[in-house]
UniProtKB/Swiss-Prot annotation:
This is tRNA-2-methylthio-N(6)-dimethylallyladenosine synthase. Monomer. InterPro entries: Elp3/MiaA/NifB-like_rSAM, Methylthiotransferase, Methylthiotransferase_CS, Methylthiotransferase_N, Methylthiotransferase_N_sf, MiaB_methiolase, rSAM, rSAM_horseshoe. [4Fe-4S] cluster 1 binds at residues 34, 70, 104. Its main location: cytoplasm. Its EC number is 2.8.4.3. It comes from the Bacteria. Residues 164-400 form the Radical SAM core domain. The lineage of its organism: Bacteria, Bacillati, Actinomycetota, Actinomycetes, Mycobacteriales. PANTHER family: CDK5 REGULATORY SUBUNIT-ASSOCIATED PROTEIN 1 (PTHR43020), MITOCHONDRIAL TRNA METHYLTHIOTRANSFERASE CDK5RAP1 (PTHR43020:SF2). It catalyses: N(6)-dimethylallyladenosine(37) in tRNA + (sulfur carrier)-SH + AH2 + 2 S-adenosyl-L-methionine = 2-methylsulfanyl-N(6)-dimethylallyladenosine(37) in tRNA + (sulfur carrier)-H + 5'-deoxyadenosine + L-methionine + A + S-adenosyl-L-homocysteine + 2 H(+).
């Protein structure tokens, strides 16, 4: 009998010299877009490793390059096809190299990917990421490109093997898809209507992660407040309070120190969630809730189904229950038809809300969205000028809020890849419980990514805190042990979005 190892070659039983095993094929996954894609890319990596591939070392040329793409921004197409063009000479020089394109842009463009980049081997969509190893093998065997785009979710990505980027923080998907119809967003047409995982499955995954040493989880959904209305299991009844119950259940998991979630929709944000946030020991005092615009007229045009005063009322109640909460948001500048009066309304809400940080975007026209057909598309120069004014205002507010923390002690979950200048400044970096980025002087070599320290804030900037007072307390963790042992520890955000700008972070995206 002869057994075949798909990645390592053929070995035989019986007489004769042993057959030399061929080296495993290497892979690289390049991720663009939102935190959903980061989660899915960890599954793509897990699938490939389960199939016998191994991660390519930094700086090496991988045998398989996978692009997990985003379709939210206008430049997503140019970015993908530009990167594919850069790989074309490598593909010509090495026909055995394989290139795969997945994610939202692949779901949207489908066969057009091969028309624009005929050297691509595999195109797969958002609903069938589990097919990637099979498609790669089929393309290699048949010498023909494979395009497989499913119209509905075949399997929850969270049920697939995972190769996580971090030993200390993990993404946990609670739902896939979105039932909203924001006019600027293409995501619902690409990821489908919302489907929710069962609470039992989610909590089982969280417990498994904690058993592996994970300290922090981020619950992911396009609209986490809608969780419970579209369970995949028909035996589970609709439950409008399911998300608050899920947060409280996370509080009962021993060893789980931090719980974050992203993103809620203001139209469905309810007081039971605020109560659960305030009363559950490990839910972090942080809320990322997209506003998009402070103008009620623009919110109607966006089909956001809430108005500015409702939004401000929610954050007022959050701050009443959790006074130290850091509240962050998403804002779009230059939506079609936005007047100076509309923009002034956004500035007014930003002043009143006092966000700790804001992810601010210039409106990007996306074919296939209702907003792309609206009159009043604004000149680039007008959008840019408003964008710069908004950034200046928010940075002033962020700096004032961060300066108020100087002299205070802060607990930090130490991270890797969060500090662009850590090597030069001899600092380490991590996230406070409220999501703020903290650069601190360790003063001792024993502190490791995954450990938990406390330190005192000595300086503030709009996007980060500096703590040069030294480490006040240091707790070694199993996550730190795993990082030291060489388990995955690549750059990863501790929950997204956070307050501050790491070197490389997923962009908030999708319909929220």
């Amino acid at each position: 009998m002869v057994a075949h190892d798909a990645a390592a070659g053929v070995t035989g039983e019986g007489a004769g010299p042993p057959v030399r095993r061929a080296p495993a094929r290497t892979y690289q996954v390049r991720t663009y877009g939102c935190q959903m894609n980061v989660h899915d890319s960890e599954r793509l990596a897990g699938l490939l490793e389960a199939a016998g591939y191994r991660r390519a070392t930094d700086g090496s040329e991988a045998d398989v390059v996978v692009f997990n793409t985003c379709a939210v921004r206008e430049n997503a197409d140019n970015r993908l096809y530009g990167n594919l063009s850069h790989l074309a000479p490598r593909k010509r020089a090495n026909p055995d190299m394989q290139i795969a394109v997945g994610g939202c842009l692949a779901q949207k463009d489908r066969d057009a990917v091969l028309r624009r980049a005929p050297w691509v081997d595999v195109v797969f969509g958002t609903h069938n990421i589990g097919s990637l190893p099979t498609l790669l093998e089929r393309a290699r065997h048949n010498k023909v490109a494979q395009v497989e785009i499913a119209e509905a979710l075949q399997q929850f990505p969270s049920s697939l093997p995972s190769s996580r980027e971090s030993a200390y923080a993990a993404w946990v998907s609670i739902s896939v898809g979105c039932n909203n119809s924001c006019t600027f967003c293409i995501v619902p047409s690409l990821r489908g209507r919302e489907v929710d995982r069962s609470p039992a499955d989610i909590l089982a995954e969280v417990r498994s992660l904690v058993n592996d040493g994970v300290l922090e989880v981020t619950l992911l959904g396009q609209n986490v407040n809608a969780y419970g209305v579209s369970f995949a299991d028909p035996a589970l009844p609709r439950n409008r309070g399911a998300f608050a119950e899920l947060l409280r259940a996370c509080g009962d998991i021993d060893g789980l120190e931090r719980v974050r979630f992203t993103s809620p929709h203001p139209a469905e944000f309810t007081d039971d969630v605020i109560e659960a946030m305030a009363q559950t020991r490990n839910v972090c005092p942080a809320l990322h809730m997209p506003l998009q615009s402070g103008s009620d007229r623009i919110l109607r045009a966006m089909r956001r189904s809430y108005r500015a005063e409702r939004y401000l009322g929610i954050i007022e109640r959050v701050r009443a229950a959790i006074p130290h909460a850091a509240i962050t948001t998403d804002l779009i500048v230059g939506f079609p038809g936005e007047t100076e009066e509309d923009f002034a309304a956004t500035l007014d809400v930003v002043r009143r809300a006092r966000f700790a940080a804001a992810f601010t975007f210039q409106y990007s026209k996306r074919p296939g969205t209702p907003a792309a057909q609206l009159d009043g598309q604004l000149p680039k120069a007008v959008v840019q000028e408003r964008y710069e004014r908004l950034i200046a205002l928010q940075e002033q507010i962020s700096l004032e809020a961060n300066r108020a923390l100087v002299g205070q002690a802060v607990e930090v979950l130490v991270a890797t890849g969060e500090g662009r200048k850590d090597t030069v400044t001899a600092r380490m970096s991590g996230r406070a419980r409220d999501g703020r980025l903290v650069h601190f002087t360790a003063g001792q070599p024993r502190v490791r990514p995954g450990d938990v320290i406390t330190t005192k804030v000595t300086e503030a900037a709009p996007h980060h805190l500096i703590a040069d007072a030294g480490v006040l307390t240091h707790r070694r963790t199993r996550a730190g042990d795993a990082h030291t042992a060489g388990q995955p520890g690549r750059a990863v955000g501790l929950g997204m979005p956070g307050v501050g700008l790491p070197v490389s972070a997923a962009k908030p995206g999708g319909c929220r």
